[in-house]
Structure formats: structure tokens, C-alpha cells
A protein has these predicted regions:
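Helix N-cap/beta->alpha junction signal
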Residues: 12, 85-86
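Phosphate-binding/catalytic loops
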Residues: 80, 86-151
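Short beta-strand scaffold positions
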Residues: 3, 83-84
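Conserved active-site segments centered on acidic
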Residues: 1-78, 142-151
Length: 151
């Protein structure tokens, strides 16, 4: 599973950390690989945003060792490329030259919300981002387990 947002410092690392936590709780760490990337290189090598780190710490979820990186062509090897908003989907498909690939999709299209995950870089609302990421990750994990029953 690869989570993608613009800078890879707010939304996608939050989703990555939440998904890792859910996978660990279920004893699936050796079965499901999780990472995140950004379509922009503006923050490459940086730790997650302070607001992301603080919200996850408050919820008992670690961001230790996480560093942002830009999307690369080898990321097409992931089975699920989960983008935080419609712009991320478009840019990811262009960058990976995978315009019709159904494994690249908008995160909340898995949920009843069917909307973009608002970027807390602009909104300042890390709580909303956290809640949407938890819902999306839980739904995505159930989908993965349904599609890969042998896990």
C-alpha cells in the first residue's frame, strides 16, 4: 500500500502511520508493506509536519524514522496506490505513466464520503484529517483482506 499526497508531510504519512498501526494490531506486519510519497519534492527528506506528529503521538501512534520522499516510477509495483485528493490521483497517474491503472485511486472513494481528504497544511485541522484517515485505513484494510484472503 502506498499513500500519496502533495508534500508527503501531512496526510500521506498520517495514513501510513495509522495503517501500520492497524496492521500491527492484527499481526500482519510481515504480510502487508506500507509506505507513503509525495507528488512534489519540496519537502523530500523531512520528517512529518509537527501537527501530524503531535496528533499521532496523542493517539499513541509512532512516526519514528519517517521521512518524506517524492513518488518514483518503481512505486507502480505497489498493489494499492492511495491518493488523498483528485489532484494527487491525476498527478500520480501522469508521473507513473499509468493513466488507466485502477490501482491508483482516491482514498475516501472507499468510504461513503467520496471526497478529498482536506490538507491540514492549509486547514490547520489535523483532527479532521486523522478521523478521515482512520476511517479510510480501516475500510482499505478490510478491502485488502477480502481481496487477498490468503493473508
Amino acid at each position: 500500500v502506498l499513500f500519496v499526497c502533495l508534500g508527503n508531510i501531512c496526510r500521506s504519512p498520517m495514513a501510513e502511520a495509522i495503517m501500520r498501526d492497524l496492521i500491527e494490531e492484527r499481526g500482519l506486519t510481515s504480510k502487508i508493506k506500507v509506505d507513503s510519497a509525495g507528488t512534489s519534492s519540496a519537502h523530500a527528506g523531512e520528517a512529518p509536519h509537527k501537527g501530524t506528529r503531535e496528533k499521532l503521538k496523542e493517539m499513541g501512534i509512532s512516526t519514528s524514522g519517517m521521512k518524506s520522499r517524492q513518488l518514483r516510477t518503481t512505486d507502480l509495483d505497489f498493489d494499492y496506490i492511495v491518493c488523498m485528493d483528485a489532484s494527487n490521483v491525476k498527478n500520480t497517474r501522469e508521473m507513473l505513466r499509468a493513466h488507466d491503472d485502477t490501482k491508483i485511486f482516491r482514498f475516501l472513494d472507499l468510504t461513503p464520503h467520496k471526497k478529498d481528504v482536506p490538507d491540514p497544511w492549509y486547514t490547520g485541522d489535523f483532527q479532521e484529517t486523522y478521523e478521515l484517515c482512520v476511517e479510510g485505513c480501516e475500510t482499505l484494510l478490510e478491502r485488502i483482506l477480502e481481496e487477498h484472503r490468503n493473508i
